[in-house]
């Protein structure tokens, strides 16, 4: 990868602007999950240790450009960052035209989405960002799929543009999983709709050895194979698409294994009566809400023999205890497998937390939309810009 890495640069005495993803949930001024702040600390510490004058910025929510509001302010983040770093972290409100910061100091620059032109990647604004620093560091993988002034434009104009440790760890893990995977490569793609994961399925089917589908997506594939799915969430108009994906897999010698048993209920409720049925016994009024134990065991065996596992999406309604066993079985199989494993996506991370397996997954992506776009085979604007500067 032709990207300049921040870890390789001499930053002594340099003004360094770091774009982090500090977009954390805040309720009544209280941060409810500080995972992203904690993740950013090593990068900031490293820049300080290297003797840099450090400026950090991030977006928070979706403020109106050109107006400051307390609810969109990074003030609670500055307080938390100061506690984690053990140094003062002043919040600078109007910073586009210049920032005072000395080597060994760090300042947090107010929510960059408040700046007029940020969202549309305005060149004048991007040049102003670039003029603030000697080195720009892009460390926000979660926004790498957005072409904005602080994630794309500034990379073009900064004297030096580098990838930060968080961003590079994410890119290295994804490259290891997709570009040069230990075989067999198995992907789990689950979710409510084929339509939302269509590009993902279409891209992965050309890379994987096994593709396990789950949730509403699986129901559409089950229907495409000629089985009844009752009242289950599925997309009849996408049956031809599902058949094409299956044909593409077969042509490559890859496999999309379908469930042989499922867990059904008559209502979509946490306390609904759950019944295990073979796939050909699903009634017209049944809802398929999980894979059955036989299927879960078969999938777990595939995971155990995989060299690489990419996991995006729980295979059942794991929030309801009666319909969580499929997802739990696969989660535990991933945790105990020797494969290189990468997990990403909001619901997937919730499952990782629920079953407490974070320490047993090789790499957990916090990238969200950027993670999905990478899996879809798309070029991420920030990554492309960093590669162009690294040539």
Swiss-Prot record:
Classification via Gene3D superfamilies: Phosphoglycerate kinase, N-terminal domain
Location of this chain's protein in the cell: Cytoplasm
Pfam families reported for this sequence: PGK (PF00162)
Superkingdom field: Bacteria
Molecular-function annotations in GO: ADP binding; ATP binding; phosphoglycerate kinase activity
GO CC annotations on file: cytosol
Catalyzed chemical reaction(s): (2R)-3-phosphoglycerate + ATP = (2R)-3-phospho-glyceroyl phosphate + ADP
InterPro entries in the cross-refs: Phosphoglycerate_kinase, Phosphoglycerate_kinase_CS, Phosphoglycerate_kinase_N, Phosphoglycerate_kinase_sf
Gene Ontology BP term (one): glycolytic process
Disulfide bond annotation, renumbered to this chain: none
Subunit structure: Monomer.
Entry similarity comment: Belongs to the phosphoglycerate kinase family.
Protein name per UniProt: Phosphoglycerate kinase
Organism classification: Bacteria, Pseudomonadati, Pseudomonadota, Gammaproteobacteria, Lysobacterales
Gene (UniProt): pgk
